[in-house]
Amino acid sequence: MNQKLLTPWKPTKAQLLAAHNKRVPDLVAKDLIVLFAGINPGLYTAAIGRHFGRPGNRFWPALYAGGFTPRLFSPFESDLLLDLKLGITNVVDRATARADELTNDELRAGGKRLEAKVKLWAPTVVAFVGIGPYRIVSGIKDARVGLQKNRFGGSHAWVLPNPSGLNAHYQPAALAQLFGDLRVWATAQHKRRQKKRPIS
């Protein structure tokens, strides 16, 4: 991979303002172990074009602490996730300054688009990064963190807390445990899935 593409950089105020409604390309491939689905990109993330890109977002540290990555990746190294059979997408594509700028109707519409994507890509698990949007998308108002009873787009559904630094309900140790629980379960499920496939 081009090392220049991995070099972190900070967007200017003008670039942040211009990032409104921008989209960040999905990081996907078929047959992933886990496809992480964020709520929608923030302005910083959209400006740099990398998922969970804002400094202070705890997604990347939680991913490492949970055992998904061999070391702490920066957002600029996100493409390396595909080698680990991990991907990232969003419920709503457009960037906003705050997630609460999205309406429930917009989240539901985004959920339908996401469901179509999941059916196409067929990850073993789709992990929603944020319980509030999952409750709206699924219509399950009492959904809790962890494995869900209902599948989503044919894949197992799992809910993780929002790793934003603004979410004080979950500290790094708790996030590490929850991400680790997902990794153990999803990896085992993926292996079982592989064994069931016919040999071509």
Q: Which functions belong to the PLM regions below?
A:
Residues 28, 33-39:
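Short, hydrophobic/glycine-enriched beta-strand segments
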Residues 40-44, 93-96, 132-134, 164-166:
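Short, solvent-exposed loop/turn segments at secondary-structure junctions
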Residues 83, 87-140:
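Internal catalytic-core helix/loop-beta-alpha segment
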Residues 45-48, 135-139, 169-170:
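Short glycine-/acidic-enriched loop or helix-start segments at secondary-structure transitions
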Residues 35-37, 129, 160:
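Short hydrophobic segments within beta-strands
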Residues 45-105:
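Short, surface-exposed acidic-centric catalytic microdomains
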Residues 23-29, 72-81, 117:
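Short amphipathic alpha-helices and their capping/turn segments at secondary-structure boundaries
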Residues 1-25, 29-30, 55, 98-114, ...:
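C-terminal capping/extension of enzyme domains
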